């Protein structure tokens, strides 16, 4: 059985989890995440709530991984990007009136 190396990453604002995993060829994204033990390191990661990707391209948990893949676990958004821009524009207009 051939062994491949992949990296599983999950980033929070103040800490990053980066785990190198040696796993059998033909394994899935889910297998690599389970092998990385990230689910036990932080309560923020869940198969049901987080999107998963390889090199910034969303994939399913059953996706077969290749040697050298970087499996990324994405955080959920805390604010809608449109709402953030709207608030940012509103604040910048308000500041212009003050100065």
Swiss-Prot record:
It comes from the Bacteria. SUPFAM superfamilies: MoaD/ThiS (SSF54285). Gene3D superfamilies: RnfH-like (3.10.20.280). Disulfide bonds: none annotated. InterPro entries: Mopterin_synth/thiamin_S_b, RnfH, RnfH_sf. Pfam families: Ub-RnfH (PF03658). NCBIfam families: PRK01777.1. Belongs to the UPF0125 (RnfH) family. This is Protein RnfH.
